[in-house]
Amino acid sequence: MTFLAILFVIAVLLLLAQLPVIGFYIRAVYFGMCLIIGGFLGGLASIPFGKSPNNHFRMFKIFQAMTWPMGVRFELRNSEILHDKKPYIIIANHQSALDVLGMSFAWPVDCVVMLKSSLKYLPGFNLCAYLCDSVYINRFSKEKALKTVDTTLHEIVTKKRKVWIYPEGTRNAEPELLPFKKGAFILAKQAKIPIVPCVFSSHKFFYSHAEKRLTSGNCIIDILPEVDSSKFDSIDDLSAHCRKIMQAHREKLDAEAANLNI
């Protein structure tokens, strides 16, 4: 009887999911649950290994498997650039929570992510983030943010870590990238390491919070050649250059993605 009841609930949810707005909320809640449960299970699986950036891969495998039914597919290009063993800063455009899924396909070894401090309170996810040695930054306190930069710099130098940063600092669904925050570029200049730009094509073809739309779709992830931070006289020049090449490439990828999502 219980089994039949479960089947009935699943059938009802599948039918409701066909209605655009209701389907959006069902898929959004499902994605959120995948993030929490995937993080928790990935965290549990990582406990025997202690804190390590490479624990990310356990969570990512679980998360990718759980979200597969959603039908959002990612095509990774130029992944060989990520295989470099030396430390670098990887910067990516940030559009939505779906970026967590996208980054799982482009994640290099020995890499930590810089997260906004509020995420440390997200159940399940916070366990995995702790065991993955993630870095939390307080965007509303300059003093605390600078302290985080100093700590991260020490990790890069002593442990040869790579760091994943979203330089826009917040989600941005618009075609034009937001002005970049300086943290990633300060780190690159002070640590004397390159920056590797990572560009995601627009999610607009399958996701829109404003339109309450979340469907299956395709996203392109392209890894651009590394940028030598030592060749720029100032942090502002380095930031402006990275933003310029990422903006141009984003527009190119969006044109391709439009054809993939017809």
Swiss-Prot record:
Top-rank EC class of the record's enzyme: transferase
Sorted UniProt keywords: Acyltransferase, Lipid biosynthesis, Lipid metabolism, Membrane, Phospholipid biosynthesis, Phospholipid metabolism, Transferase, Transmembrane, Transmembrane helix
UniProt xrefs under SUPFAM superfamilies: Glycerol-3-phosphate (1)-acyltransferase (SSF69593)
GO cellular component, one term: endoplasmic reticulum
One GO MF term: 1-acylglycerol-3-phosphate O-acyltransferase activity
Pathway linked to the protein: Phospholipid metabolism; CDP-diacylglycerol biosynthesis; CDP-diacylglycerol from sn-glycerol 3-phosphate: step 2/3
Classification via Pfam families: Acyltransferase
CDD domains reported in the protein's UniProt record: LPLAT_AGPAT-like (cd07989)
Annotated EC: 2.3.1.51
Location(s), subcellular: Membrane
Membrane topology: Multi-pass membrane protein
Keyword Membrane (UniProt): yes
GO biological process: CDP-diacylglycerol biosynthetic process; phosphatidic acid biosynthetic process
Annotated domain remarks: The HXXXXD motif is essential for acyltransferase activity and may constitute the binding site for the phosphate moiety of the glycerol-3-phosphate.
Annotated family: Belongs to the 1-acyl-sn-glycerol-3-phosphate acyltransferase family.
PANTHER family for the chain: 1-ACYL-SN-GLYCEROL-3-PHOSPHATE ACYLTRANSFERASE, 1-ACYL-SN-GLYCEROL-3-PHOSPHATE ACYLTRANSFERASE ACL-1-RELATED
Primary role: Converts lysophosphatidic acid (LPA) into phosphatidic acid by incorporating an acyl moiety at the sn-2 position of the glycerol backbone.
Protein name, UniProt field: Putative 1-acyl-sn-glycerol-3-phosphate acyltransferase acl-1
Native source species: Caenorhabditis elegans
Gene that this polypeptide is encoded by: acl-1
